[in-house]
Amino acid sequence: MDMLRSACFYFLLIVFVILSWSLLCDSRHLGHMEKKLSVNLDLLNKDNEEITKLEAPSTNKTNTLLSQSHAVVNHGDNGQINGKKTKEIHRVKRASDKKVSSKRVSRTWKIPKYPKKQPKSDQEHPGFNLDYMQPTTHPPHHN
C-alpha cells in the first residue's frame, strides 16, 4: 500500500512539473509562423506603402521624389505591370539599398572616426581592454 502511494505521488509530481513548464512557456508554435509566411502579396504592398508614408520627412526634395517613384510594383505571371505589358526590366528599390543616417542609431559612447588602414591604438575605449584582462594572480597587500 505504501509503495502504491509513493508511485502515485511521483507520477503526479512528474505530471505537475511537465504541465507547469508547458504553461509557463510563451513561445510561438511553428504552425503560427507558417501561416504568417503565406501572406497575400497585396497586403505586403499596402503595408510597404504605409511604411513609406510613416518615414521621417526628408529635407531634400529629390530623395522624396525618388522614394515615391520606386514604389513596389505587383508583377503578374504574363509580364504585366499594373495592367500594362512591358518588356523592359524594372528595378524595385529595396529597403536595404536606402542609406540610414547615423543620427538614428543610439550609442553609449562616441565612436571615433579613424581611417580604416591605420587605427589609433592609444585612443581605444577603456572598457574593451578591461573586459579581456587576464585574472590577477597576486593577492592584495594590506598594510
From Swiss-Prot:
GO terms for biological process: cell differentiation; lateral root development; regulation of root development; regulation of root morphogenesis; response to auxin. Residues 74-143 are annotated as: Disordered. The modification Sulfotyrosine is found at residue 132. Induction: Induced by auxin. It comes from the Eukaryota. The keyword Nucleus applies. Expressed in root tips. One of its GO terms (molecular function) is growth factor activity. Belongs to the RGF family. Glycans are attached at residue 60. This is Root meristem growth factor 10. A motif (Nuclear localization signal) lies at residues 92-99. Keywords: Differentiation, Glycoprotein, Growth factor, Hydroxylation, Nucleus, Secreted, Signal, Sulfation. Residues 1-27 form the signal peptide. Residues 28-130 form a propeptide. The gene is RGF10. The modification Hydroxyproline is found at residue 140. When applied in the extracellular space, triggers a root waving phenotype. But seems to have a physiological nuclear subcellular location where it promotes root elongation. The keyword DNA-binding does not apply. GO terms for cellular component: extracellular region; nucleus. It comes from Arabidopsis thaliana. Residues 74-83 have a biased composition (Polar residues). The tyrosine sulfation is critical for the function of the peptide.
